[in-house]
């Protein structure tokens, strides 16, 4: 067993002898180097912690209580010749041995009867357990316990020792026990029969006075004054102990040393051949020597109630019958003496063994605690299911060793199924709420914990209620073994967080694991984060309950509903911060990698060293050899992780009738080398070579290639219950597999072979899952069909296959365990690709057309950046092939550049797939690029390639030189086809939706018109502006381009009463324009200023008034969505896709949405808002479209305008409404809705089919081809199930942006912004898997362009990239030097005049806003001036061109600035300062109203504005 325990210690741990412990706590762990990286849309920041310490803490105090129990006998050590061939005691052989003893002269049968009774009770474990306890009590006796000391403290609440151990007293370990001594008596050789209940042991030589004292105390009652774990209470083992010692016994001396205890143990074990008893005792003490110091306040619940330590009844007849002990001892393990020998040589190793054992136990108990009681393996069954060989009691060391086996993934063998030792699972199994007493340290404590008292004061004692036991320890010694997301114990990891600008710096997590990972990495980086649990309302922080760089949210199970909100503005960098987070923007990617591990221990915050020689561990091979021998012994107990295996038979029946009427079918061959999926009306329908209506035959040159076997079969994909072919929505069964009958033995792919037997319905193993199917005989094939209802969340691999089939995105084979289609595709073109690489060349003409709307500032990569600058270049290999195909495709430079850049960016494996696709289609085509991008999503996670690199291939076209079909647009809005749901039904479902939201505490923003309009200069958006009213038209016409927006018009207008707008006719006028997107164009409908203003004010922040499962507004971010989806990880992902959703809404449906909203929230609105909302409701009756390019105007009979203020709101509400009407709430356990996006988790494929059918019945139009069923869980453009969140994003989109800006983007005005944009785009494509070697040269050329554009030297740009933010650079934790980069205006008289003109134009809006601020912030009204507010607001209309210049300062000042960055981030009242800091004349005075001390610091700084920005 010592070999097993040694193997629990990590390789970097090199234990030595002589450990001196003098403190009740020891912190153990490892130092490692952690390289960390943070990326967002603003750039990349890196940092390294060369000496990071990951640790747990253990204490020598614990709440244990020993009880005497009957346990099985340990027979090792008795003479081997009294056992029969089965390993059982034979009383006949016992009698024969006794009859030969010189001590037994008469009445041998009677002695044999006594011996039989005693031998079957033989167990010395408890005696050795107490002696081991005495050894360490003596050795480390100076350890002190103080009842008023803190057991646990996190800054919010603490738990005192006296609260956990109410009856304890201050004491040292040794003084905590005043042990009586049991009677130790010399065995009388003339004793006729054994004395009842008095054990008798053997002893070599004379029992010394110290040994007598040790034995007497070891047999006595332990009644401690202090709760030291090894000194826990235990009853008296025996009132009297006989010792058969030839040389006699000395009277007790009353004193001894720990070395005396070691000598006594050695003598006692060897004399009684009790090595196995000692091993059990050693394991018991390893269980109780130390206890965890919990990682959370709730984890203290594990230790509130005393843990029971089962101590076997002391029973030994060796002293009575020495003849049965000393001759050729029986033992079940050849290594039975190793544990004693190892302990004698290295007694301090028990401490490490104890730490390793309890860590494995509590880590795995953390997992067991989260398992549902209804699961096959749960907290009640995990031990008995892991035991192989015989039943056992679920208690003691068996349970702990089971947990060790589960944690380390190994098999552990024991010679006896003993039940002695500590049973840790009592707290887990009692299933009741546990109350943990705490002392309040922070009055906000109830926000973090489920406290009984909600209003508390500092120092008050209260109680935390715990229902779900969290882990008490984290993996440290077992770090990196069987890693899990839950424990964040990966050597390298990453997490991605979406932060859209609308989120206002708030990240919402719906996945407890992702949330924990985020909090952990932030902690590693040195950032304190506080989050709010949106389900319970409580707060959690990554610094209070956790340490060592890891955070674990433990209040709920994974399956439970979770949601966590993190306000990124409150993230606080610590004094030691390695990667600080400033103004997160867009997608945040946090990652780390750990290397260079070194063990470390601390006691009283000082290093704890072991001196002396290295420990020589027993060879692992010896342990394994012994384990192999044990496996052949019936009486040996084996523990291993439980696994179910089952063998089932295949079967088949016949196909009744095949009617090909609009259904899909597959053409299959018995050889199984090709699958062709087709749709049509009959078998005689013709097709183009290699192409079908639902897909393409990958790698098949012509139809004859299907006949690799002797015959091909037309096999329906879908059948009904009568075996009649149907389309997918009308069928009940779907094809999943076919086997050729010629193969009499069928291999399921997992090493199990089965013979086909001909049963119509049966179970089969398919894709590693057990599936119930019906088999249909079709020629020489057995086709296996599964009922939709039988494809469940317990067969997720099959669900992915069926989902791909239903979506017409089939990329799998059916026959005889085919390869996946992509592997086959790559293999089919292997020779062709090799020839192209080695031989193919192409003369490429570099003169290409410019994209019609491309301006100079849009292009970031040009052809001359990729190839030599000449008219014709000779290309080779894949680039030559792509050039040839591009020339056939189009002649647009931006398209060519994007494809070439994408090819260079692709990793080698995915590059082979892309080139094979190009060869398969013999060129590039908009249609296949789009369809293959869609199919790649369905294949993600089911094939060996990272298909995310092929998502949305069509965006690589990067510019389409075409126009919107405006006539078609007009037809679609005049001859409408909307969903057929009544006004009453829409009202009912939407009221239901908003009532749920209100129950969650969601509310609209309440505001009077005067407040709203006075803030117009800052709250109006900056989008394009239109108006049908002459007053606004005149204003818009004369405004300069920079302020020709809603914000600009509103700011220019004077104060207006609400009736200025409400007196107008309710109507919506939309003005069309063309939006140029990657690979396509679409129509935009920008709506008029009046309808926008009324809608925005009347339904203010309406996007935040949906329930939690509708993440819009501030909740529409990746983190919140992941948290919501966390509860669906065990369900089948189902991404429903609406087809052209805007065009499906009737006017009545849209009006019903507003009516429902007003009816639910009317009491939370002002009268002004209700009036505006009703005006907006009525405006839907009259919708008018203007087409400026044709001059045509027409009335719109329905549908939704894409550019209206309420577009997302309406789409989201009606999204839910239509599907609620289709039964989504009964068919789907959980779903998420946002705009036209839907994500759901379904239990069976049948539920998803029913939802599609029910929705279609009311006229809802869906695009099944874009539905991802069973594979990726895509919602809001992020795959929620991707292991690598960054990899789940789209490389194609990143490359398109890297090469060409969005066409609506403006020319760059500042050098800093341009370089930052280049850096962000570069970092993003690298994060998405682009080749750094191929992309870096292009990135350097972009930086060169920036340098030339702004006429600066090379080192200016280089320093911007590498220097720290404190020095004016773009790098967090970048290089620090005396140089500082400063942004300065490029002198330009035109920009100066334009700025002055804008300031004058917006003066009315600024004046109203200034008055608003003075009214609402009266305490600092004197500091608010119109002039500074004008300057602040004018910055929104940036017209000044800026460059970067060098300046110099003292190096220490730079380091000081970086060191104090964000030091005041948690400053109270900071929100007020942030809101008005740019609009006050005396910033120090403002701060003095909030914090005089900080104001004094600013006053002395010399530059208050700068230092306030640095410090906050």
UniProtKB/Swiss-Prot annotation:
The keyword RNA-binding applies. Keywords: Hydrolase, Nucleotide-binding, Nucleotidyltransferase, RNA-binding, RNA-directed RNA polymerase, Transferase, Viral RNA replication. It comes from the Viruses. InterPro entries: DNA/RNA_pol_sf (IPR043502), Major_coat_LA-virus (IPR015302), Major_coat_LA-virus_sf (IPR036332), RNA-dir_pol_luteovirus (IPR001795). GO terms for biological process: DNA-templated transcription; viral translational frameshifting. Gene3D superfamilies: Major capsid protein (3.90.1840.10). The keyword Transferase applies. Its EC number is 2.7.7.48. It catalyses: RNA(n) + a ribonucleoside 5'-triphosphate = RNA(n+1) + diphosphate. Pfam families: LA-virus_coat, RdRP_4. GO terms for molecular function: hydrolase activity; nucleotide binding; RNA binding; RNA-directed RNA polymerase activity. Belongs to the totiviridae RNA-directed RNA polymerase family. RNA-dependent RNA polymerase which replicates the viral genome. Catalyzes the transcription of fully conservative plus-strand genomic RNAs that are extruded from the virion into the cytoplasm where they function as mRNAs for translation of viral proteins and also as substrates for encapsidation to form new virions. Once encapsidated, the positive strand is converted to dsRNA by the RNA-directed RNA polymerase. One molecule or two of Gag capsid protein is replaced in the virion by Gag-Pol because the fusion protein is essential for RNA encapsidation and replication. This is Probable RNA-directed RNA polymerase. It comes from Saccharomyces cerevisiae virus L-BC.
């Amino acid at each position: 067993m010592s070999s097993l325990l040694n193997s629990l210690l990590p390789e970097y741990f090199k234990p030595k002898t002589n450990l001196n412990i003098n403190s009740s706590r020891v912190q153990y762990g490892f130092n490692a180097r952690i390289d960390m990286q943070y990326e967002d849309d603003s750039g990349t920041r890196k940092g390294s912690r060369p000496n990071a310490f990951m640790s747990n803490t253990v204490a020598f105090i614990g709440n244990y209580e020993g009880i005497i129990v009957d346990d099985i006998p340990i027979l090792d050590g008795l003479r081997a010749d009294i056992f029969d061939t089965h390993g059982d005691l034979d009383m006949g052989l016992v009698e024969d041995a006794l009859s030969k003893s010189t001590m037994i002269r008469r009445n041998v049968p009677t002695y044999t009867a006594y011996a039989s009774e005693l031998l079957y009770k033989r167990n010395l474990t408890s005696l050795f357990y107490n002696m081991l306890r005495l050894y360490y009590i003596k050795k480390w006796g100076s350890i002190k316990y103080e009842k008023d000391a803190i057991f646990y403290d996190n800054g919010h609440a603490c738990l005192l020792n006296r609260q956990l151990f109410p009856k304890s007293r201050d004491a040292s370990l040794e003084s905590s026990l005043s042990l009586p001594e049991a009677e130790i008596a010399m065995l009388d050789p003339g004793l006729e029969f054994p004395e009842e209940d008095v054990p008798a042991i053997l002893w070599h030589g004379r029992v010394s006075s110290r040994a007598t004292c040790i034995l007497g105390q070891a047999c006595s009652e332990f009644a401690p004054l202090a709760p030291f774990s090894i000194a826990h209470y235990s009853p008296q083992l025996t009132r009297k102990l006989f010792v058969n010692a030839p040389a006699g016994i000395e009277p007790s001396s009353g004193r001894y040393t720990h070395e005396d205890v070691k000598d006594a143990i050695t003598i006692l074990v060897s004399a009684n051949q009790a090595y196995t008893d000692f091993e059990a005792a050693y394991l018991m003490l390893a269980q109780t020597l130390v206890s965890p110091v919990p990682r959370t306040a709730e984890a203290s619940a594990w230790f509130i109630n005393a843990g029971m330590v089962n101590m076997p009844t002391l029973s030994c007849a060796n002293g009575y019958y020495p003849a049965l002990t000393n001759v050729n001892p029986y033992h079940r393990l050849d290594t039975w003496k190793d544990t004693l020998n190892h302990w004698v040589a290295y007694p301090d190793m028990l401490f490490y063994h104890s730490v390793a054992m309890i860590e494995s136990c509590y880590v795995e108990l953390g997992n067991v605690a989260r398992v549902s009681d209804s699961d096959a393996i749960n907290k009640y069954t995990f031990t008995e299911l892991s035991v192989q060989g015989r039943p056992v009691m679920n208690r003691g060391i068996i349970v702990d060793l089971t947990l060790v086996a589960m944690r380390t993934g190994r098999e552990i063998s024991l010679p006896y199924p003993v039940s002695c030792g500590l049973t840790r699972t009592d707290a887990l199994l009692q299933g009741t709420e546990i109350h943990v007493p705490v002392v309040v340290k922070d009055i906000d404590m109830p926000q973090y914990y489920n406290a009984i008292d909600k209003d508390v004061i500092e120092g008050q004692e209260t109680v935390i209620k715990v229902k779900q036991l969290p882990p008490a320890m984290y993996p440290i010694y077992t770090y990196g073994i069987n890693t899990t997301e839950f424990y964040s114990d990966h050597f390298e990891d990453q997490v991605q967080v979406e932060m859209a600008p609308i989120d206002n710096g708030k990240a919402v997590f719906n996945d407890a694991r992702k949330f924990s990972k985020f909090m952990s990495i932030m902690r590693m980086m040195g950032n304190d984060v506080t989050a709010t649990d949106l389900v319970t309302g409580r707060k959690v922080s990554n610094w209070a309950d956790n340490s060592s760089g890891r955070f674990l949210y433990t209040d709920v199970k994974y399956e439970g509903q979770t949601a966590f909100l993190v306000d990124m503005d409150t993230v606080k960098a610590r004094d030691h911060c390695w990667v600080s987070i400033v103004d997160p923007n867009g997608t945040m990617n946090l990652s780390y990698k750990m290397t260079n591990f070194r063990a470390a221990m601390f006691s009283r915050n000082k290093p704890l060293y072991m001196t002396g020689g290295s420990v020589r561990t027993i060879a692992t091979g010896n342990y394994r050899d012994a384990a192999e021998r044990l496996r052949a012994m019936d009486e040996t107990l084996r523990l291993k992780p439980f696994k179910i295996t089952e063998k089932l038979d295949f079967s088949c029946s016949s196909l009744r009738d095949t009617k090909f009427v609009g259904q899909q079918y597959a053409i299959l061959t018995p050889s199984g080398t090709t699958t062709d999926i087709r749709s049509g009306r009959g078998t005689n329908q013709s097709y183009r070579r290699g192409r079908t209506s639902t897909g393409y035959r990958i790698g098949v040159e012509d139809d004859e290639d299907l006949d690799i076997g002797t015959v091909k079969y037309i096999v329906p994909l879908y059948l009904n219950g009568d075996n009649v072919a149907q389309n997918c929505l009308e069928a009940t069964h779907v094809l999943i597999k076919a086997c050729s009958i010629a193969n009499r033995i069928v291999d399921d792919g997992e090493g199990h072979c089965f013979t086909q037997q001909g049963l119509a319905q049966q179970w089969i193993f398919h894709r590693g899952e057990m599936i119930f199917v019906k088999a249909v005989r079709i020629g020489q094939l057995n086709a296996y069909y599964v009922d939709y209802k039988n494809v469940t969340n317990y067969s997720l691999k099959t669900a992915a296959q069926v989902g791909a089939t239903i979506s017409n995105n089939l990329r799998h084979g059916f026959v005889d365990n085919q390869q996946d289609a992509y592997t086959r595709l790559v293999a089919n073109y292997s020779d062709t690709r090799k020839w192209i690489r080695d031989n193919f060349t192409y003369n490429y003409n570099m003169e290409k057309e410019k994209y019609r709307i491309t301006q100079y500032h849009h292009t970031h990569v040009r052809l001359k950046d990729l190839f030599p600058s000449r008219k014709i270049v000779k290309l080779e290999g894949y680039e030559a092939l792509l050039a040839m195909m591009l020339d056939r495709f189009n002649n647009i430079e931006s398209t060519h550049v994007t494809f070439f850049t994408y090819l260079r960016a692709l990793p080698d494996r995915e590059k082979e797939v892309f080139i094979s696709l190009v060869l398969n289609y013999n060129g590039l085509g908009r249609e296949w690029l789009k369809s293959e991008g869609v199919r790649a999503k369905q294949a993600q996670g089911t094939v060996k390639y990272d298909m995310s690199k092929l998502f949305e291939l069509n965006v690589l076209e990067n510019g389409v030189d075409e126009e919107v079909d405006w006539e078609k647009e007009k037809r679609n809005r005049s001859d409408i086809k909307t969903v057929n749901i009544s006004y009453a039904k829409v009202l009912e479902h939407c009221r239901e939706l908003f009532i749920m939201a209100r129950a969650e505490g969601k509310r609209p923003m309440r505001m009077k018109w005067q407040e709203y309009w006075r803030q117009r200069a800052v709250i109006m958006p900056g989008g394009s502006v239109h108006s049908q009213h002459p007053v606004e038209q005149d204003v818009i016409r004369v405004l300069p381009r920079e302020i020709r927006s809603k914000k600009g018009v509103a700011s220019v207008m004077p104060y207006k009463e609400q009736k200025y707008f409400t007196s107008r006719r309710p109507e919506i006028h939309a003005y069309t324009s063309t939006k140029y997107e990657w690979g396509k164009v679409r129509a935009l409908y920008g709506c008029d200023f009046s309808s926008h203003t009324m809608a925005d004010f009347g339904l203010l922040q309406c996007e935040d008034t949906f329930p939690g499962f509708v993440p819009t507004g501030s909740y529409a971010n990746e983190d919140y969505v992941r948290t919501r989806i966390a509860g669906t990880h065990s369900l089948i992902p189902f991404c429903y896709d609406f087809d052209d959703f805007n065009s499906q809404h009737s006017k009545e449906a849209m009006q019903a949405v507003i009516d429902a909203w007003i009816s639910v929230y009317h009491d939370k609105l002002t009268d002004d808002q209700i009036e505006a909302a009703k005006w907006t409701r009525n405006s839907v009756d009259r919708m008018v479209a203007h087409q400026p390019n044709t001059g045509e105007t027409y009335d719109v009979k329905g549908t939704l305008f894409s550019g209206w203020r309420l577009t997302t709101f309406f789409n989201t509400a009606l999204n839910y409404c239509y599907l609620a009407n289709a039964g989504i709430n009964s068919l789907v356990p959980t779903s998420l809705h946002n705009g036209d996006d839907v994500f759901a988790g379904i239990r069976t494929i049948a539920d998803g089919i029913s939802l599609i059918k029910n929705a279609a019945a009311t006229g809802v139009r869906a695009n099944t081809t874009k539905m991802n069923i069973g594979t990726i869980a895509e919602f809001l453009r992020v795959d929620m199930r991707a292991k690598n969140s960054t990899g789940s994003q789209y490389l194609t989109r990143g490359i398109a942006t890297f090469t060409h800006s969005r066409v609506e983007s403006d020319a760059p005005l500042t050098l800093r912004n341009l370089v930052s944009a280049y850096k962000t785009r570069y970092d993003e494509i690298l994060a998405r898997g682009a080749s750094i070697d191929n992309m870096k040269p292009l990135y350097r050329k972009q930086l060169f362009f920036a340098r030339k554009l702004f006429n600066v030297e090379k080192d200016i740009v280089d320093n911007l990239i590498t220097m720290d933010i404190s020095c004016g650079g773009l790098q967090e934790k970048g290089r620090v030097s005396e140089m500082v980069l400063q942004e300065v205006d490029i002198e330009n008289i035109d920009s100066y005049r334009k700025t002055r003109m804008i300031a004058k134009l917006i003066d009315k809006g600024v004046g109203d806003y200034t008055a608003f601020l003075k009214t609402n912030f009266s305490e600092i009204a004197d500091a608010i001036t119109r002039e500074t507010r004008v300057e602040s607001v004018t910055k929104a209309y940036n017209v000044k061109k800026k460059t970067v210049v060098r300046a110099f300062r003292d190096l220490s000042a730079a380091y000081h600035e970086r060191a104090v960055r964000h030091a005041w981030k948690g400053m109270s009242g900071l929100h007020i300062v942030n809101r008005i800091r740019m609009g006050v004349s005396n910033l120090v005075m403002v701060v003095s109203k909030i914090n005089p001390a900080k104001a004094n610091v600013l006053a002395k700084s010399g530059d208050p504005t700068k230092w306030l920005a640095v410090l906050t």
